[in-house]
Structures are given as C-alpha cells and as structure tokens.
Amino acid sequence: MSVTLQRMKTPHERLSEIVGNLEVRGAYAQIGLGTGESARTILQSTPLDKKLVIIDPYGSMGYRMMDDDKLGYPSIKVSRDNNVQIEILAGLYKLALESEKHFLFYPMEDIEFYQRFQTGIFYYDEGEQIRTNEYGFVYFNAENCIGDLIEGIRFMNERTPKDGVWIFNNINDYNTRQQELLDELMEEANMDAQWESDFLVATKTIEPSDCLKPKQEAYAEDNETLTADVSTDPSITYH
C-alpha cells in the first residue's frame, strides 16, 4: 500500500491561494510593507480590475512591537531606511509594469491613513476619477502595538463587504491574551476567524450597514465619532 503525503503550503503559496480565489467588491489593501515579499505575492494574485493599496511609513522610524522587551517595556523596532525602501518599491513597480497590475502606495503610518481617508480614497483610471471606500481584502502585515491593530480593525470593519477577507500575519508574535482579544474583535466585527499555522484568516459574514454612504462614521484617536460630510459629485464614480 502506497501512502501519498501532501506537502504543506508555504505562507506565500497559501496567501496566493486566498487572494487568487477571492471574488468580492472593493479594493485590496496591505497594512505594512515589510520586505515587500508579501506585497509581490498579493500583487501577482490580484485580478487586473482591482487596485492594491499599500500603506507604510517611508524611511527610518521607530515603532512599538507586539511583544515586550526583557525588562517588560514595549519593544521598539526601527523600520527600514530610505535606501532599502526605494529598492523594495522599485521592485514592486517593475513587477506592476511587467504584469500590468496596479497598486497605490501611501507613505504614512496606518493610524494616519485611517484619519485622513475616512471618506474614501480617490484615484484616476483611464481618465475617470474614482472614489472607493470599500476594502474586500486586507492583509495586516504591521508588526506594531495591539492598540494600532485595533484601530485598523475598527476602520476596516465599516468598509469590508460580505465575503471580504482579512489576513493577520505574525500571529506567532501574539501572546495568549492578544490572541483571545483578536478572537473577541473578530466576533464583534462579524468575521468568521480561522487560526492557521501562519495566518489568522477571517471572512466577513454580513454586509456592513453603511459601507458606501457618503457620510461615513469613523473612529478618532480620542474615541469620539467623527462624521465627514462628502458632497455627491456626478463626475466621480463611486466603487
């Protein structure tokens, strides 16, 4: 009797499989660029009619990690410097050119993005101005503090349609309490969460009530609710 052993997928193979099989409204987003390898995998697997939004601060800066240092204080990691970042971005733009895929890069911290673009992002495509405030796929790649991750979940919860998928990387860096907190947040956000060997994969089970409304409620740093009034412009296509 012969036994066939099934090879486990690598993280990039699994990521490519999820993105490639996804059929959902909205843009795709990656929070945190890292080495750029995950972005390459996502970009290669993204449909031609989708835009990938990448959010990452450009240049050397310190940011808090999930875990504490040896003395119990929040550990700090310095992001890659300008020269490394430009090399990573150059490789991504080369891939985009060769594959005819497109991505939008926002050089800022994730919290700043959430504050600035509560009512959606604008871009031009074939001469048409487009506004989108939906994210059907989100890859949380930021190795930052749990508080920032919560803000990202709050922001995306209002903007992810039914069957949208979130993937959380670096799950082995979370302690037991952080994993429990993520489970609680996924339940509150109506996400069906599955812990895998490399990722937490969560799928939206219902439509958010106000995902496409011009008046979009969002969370601010002081935990107050902001309402941004956006006038309806007939020349803009809303996605």
Segments from the language model and where they lie:
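S-adenosylmethionine/decaboxylated-SAM
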Residues: S2-L5, H12-H239
